[in-house]
Amino acid sequence: MQFEITTEYIKLDSLLKGVNIVGSGGEAKLVIADGEVRVNGVVELRRGRKLYPGDRVRLGDHEFGVERAAGAV
């Protein structure tokens, strides 16, 4: 699944909320702190990690790619 952004980057916790895989920022913080999230195949423990187009995020059986929205600067 692809997640489109209109800005230069999106923070990891915001992406997890944006794809509705977590219900809140607190829940995002917990799954990240527990080492359940991988960015580009590497466990990521920073909820503020900046994600750019081309980055891949995985949580359990869910995987998301970050891409620039059409027409975004």
Q: Which stretches of residues belong to each language-model region?
A:
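A basic, amphipathic helix-loop patch mediating RNA/tRNA/ribosome contacts
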Residues: T7-P53
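C-terminal structural segments of small proteins and small subunits
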Residues: E44-V73
